[in-house]
Amino acid sequence: MPFALYLDAAETRVEIPSDELCDATLVCGFLGCDLRPFNPLIETLPRLMHLRAEEGQDWVAQYMRQVVAESKHKRLGGEAMLERMSEMMFIDAVRRYIEALPETSRGWLAGLRDRFVGRVLALMHDAPADAWTVDELGRRVGLSRSALHERFAELIGQTPIQYLANWRIQVGAALLRNTSSTVAMVAQEVGYESEATFTKAFKRLTGNSPALWRRRIGSGASVGNHRKIK
C-alpha cells in the first residue's frame, strides 16, 4: 500500500543496490495479545500477510497518518487512540485475508468462513459451558451428525468436541487471568463438573495447573511450553 503518498514519517535512508531509483516508506508497529494456551486466530495466520492497496481503503491510509502523528507527539489520550486504531487495522487485515482465501483452504479461518462450521464455532464460543453434542450442534445448523463431524474435522483439523474442550480451557485461562474467581468457580463457568477434571484438562493443554498458571501470569513469569493444538 503506497503510504509514502500520505505519510510524513520519520525517515531512515537505506541504500539498496538497484538499477531503478524509487522511494518507499516503512511504518512499523507492534500489536500484542494476551497470553493464552489456545489462540486459534494467531495460530492460523501466516507469518506475513501482504495486502495490496484497493479501492475503498483510503481510511487505512488516513489511520496510518494519524498513528504516526500520535506516536510522534505523545498527546493526551494518544495511547488509547493508538490501541483502538491498531485493533481496527488488524481486524480489517484479517477480514481481507479471509475474503481472499481460496475455496480449498483449510484451517480455523476457513472454518470461520464456512456457513455451517462458522455457525458451530459461534455457538460454542458464545456458550462454552453448555453440554454440546455433535447431534445438537448439527441440529442447530441443519446438518446430520456425520456430515457435521466430517466437515468440521476436514476444515478445522479437530472434531467439534475436541475443539470445544480446547476452547473451554481458553476461556478458563482468561477467567483465571482477569478475575479473582476460584479454580472451582472457573471450572463450573466453562462447563466442567469438578475442579479436578478441569485441572487435569488444563494441565494437559498448558503444562501447568490452573493455580500455577495464574501465579505465573500474575508475576509476569514464563508459563512453560504451550502445546500446539492438533
Residue ranges of predicted features:
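N-terminal regulatory/effector-sensing and dimerization cores
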Residues: 1-43
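Generic alpha-helical structural signal
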Residues: 8, 61, 65, 118-121
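A short, N-terminal "cap"/entry segment at the start of jelly-roll beta-barrel domains
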Residues: 21-25, 39, 47-55, 223-224
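Residues forming well-ordered secondary-structure scaffolds
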Residues: 22-24, 58-62, 84
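Glycine-rich, flexible loop/turn motifs
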Residues: 37-47, 104-108, 188, 201, ...
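A short, charged helix-loop
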Residues: 42-68
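Short, Lys/Arg-enriched, Trp-marked, Pro/Gly-tolerant hinge/linker segments that flank
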Residues: 49-57, 71-86, 90-130, 134-141, ...
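Terminal helix-turn-helix DNA-binding modules in bacterial transcription factors
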Residues: 119-126, 130-138, 143-144, 150-199, ...
